[in-house]
Amino acid sequence: SCNAYRIGITGPPGAGKSSITNQLIKHYRKKNKRVGVLLVDPTSPFTHGAILGDRIRMNEYHSDDNVFIRSLATRGSKGGLSKNINYISNILEYAGFDIIIFETVGVGQVELDVVESVDSVVVTLVPESGDDIQIMKAGLIEIADIYVINKYDRKDSDKMYLFLKNMLSMIDKNKWMPPIV
């Protein structure tokens, strides 16, 4: 049956998106789920090449037939994803993968296409993700189903937590309240 659950991992560059993705793979494999991972890397505007290096950090799964990891380049796509990512995710779904994780490039203010492609969005932030205004401008506040404050041992992590908590207090109480973890 084709009913894969799609999870988008997004956030600014260096927030630890690949670390979160790695932990999700581990979690779902313990539950005997087949996991497809589509990692998106930016394309250089100068050379038009891409490093495609995120999967190097996930080499513990290279011999696991129930984990498929593919790096994709943006190739001019401005939304934080690769143009073909939805087609590839459909192929993974038809191939029997239960969970499909989309990891976006480090996002800015207009790179929020992940919302249209997944069932749940995990916004990964770090204490130094920027001041409150920058985070609001980036649009990340509105798209999260779950917030992850990564690298919580760093300075100002409590400040980031309080900022998110205050922002969420303004949301209609009858709507989904994204947890902060």
Residue ranges of model-derived segments:
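Nucleotide-state-sensitive switch-loop elements of NTP-binding domains
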Residues: 1-7, 15, 24-110, 117-132
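P-loop (Walker A) phosphate-binding loop of NTP-binding proteins
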Residues: 12
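Walker A/P-loop
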Residues: 18
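Short hydrophobic alpha-helical runs that function as membrane-insertion/retention elements
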Residues: 36, 122-123, 147-150, 154
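Divalent-cation-assisted or electrostatically stabilized phosphate/pyrophosphate-binding catalytic cores
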Residues: 135
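Canonical P-loop GTPase G-domain recognition
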Residues: 143-146, 152-181
